[in-house]
Amino acid sequence: MMNEYLKQYITLQKQFRETKGNPDSVRALYDFKEGLEQNEDKQAKEVLVDVYDLLDYKKSAYDLLCQIGDRSDKKTLKRLGTLKEYAENWGNHYAIPKPKTPEEKQKEKERQAQLGLPTFRYHPDPLDTGAFEESEEGIVCDCCSKTTHIYYTAPFFSVEDIEHLCPECIASGEAARKYSGSFQDDYSVDDGVDDPEKLDELIHRTPGYSGWQQEYWRAHCGDYCAFLGYVGARELRAHGVLEEVLDDPMWDEEQKEMIQESVNGGHLQCYLFQCLHCGKHLVWMDFD
């Protein structure tokens, strides 16, 4: 007899498949996941493995199945083998993101403020995108020689080999000035921004991102866009912006099909941007 956890999972899975992972279906799966995580019932944990797997929390799915799975069962052993490969190669890094509510976005801003993270107009959430990482022990910034608990991990183009930069030295422009460096190639940006100060802010005072090829920055409404993160088609659907990013004269029909087939962390990678003025979402894409 099918238990209630499995019945609910099948309903949510069907909704997720039929809507191609739209924001409501992803949010419903996350709510279900969070409830199951508080439940000690073995049947709930068995279904939680399926939810983790569907949302691409591969490491979490593997770890939990290792704990509760019957290793005398051939199906369980086969699934463990498949999940192990994904867990080792992907971890939970490419999990489908939970669409954030306005309240959650505000809490994230408050957390960044508590950490003392400067505001970057063109890269508003650099901790979430991975441009910065946190260190409990602290790391010495190469530029100011002060200990920082948040340090830069994305590209910095300079003659000298710089390992660690703190957010303050990036925001002030001191890192770019001291090392005659930049965080973004000034030729790899969209046209249409006439204000040289905006270009200076982008390349000298904004954390960059890591692309497969040369990183490229989108622009709209006469200004550079905010970089929101790394995405594939599933993430674009989860954010509810897939159709919006396809409505872009940058891409021909063949390229639009490629965007719809892109996979975060895969051979064809997309990068999500948003206009600071009208709110339109745009992507850049490249290959490994």
PLM regions and their residue ranges:
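Generic helix N-cap/helix-start motif at coil->alpha-helix transitions
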Residues: 2-12, 39-45
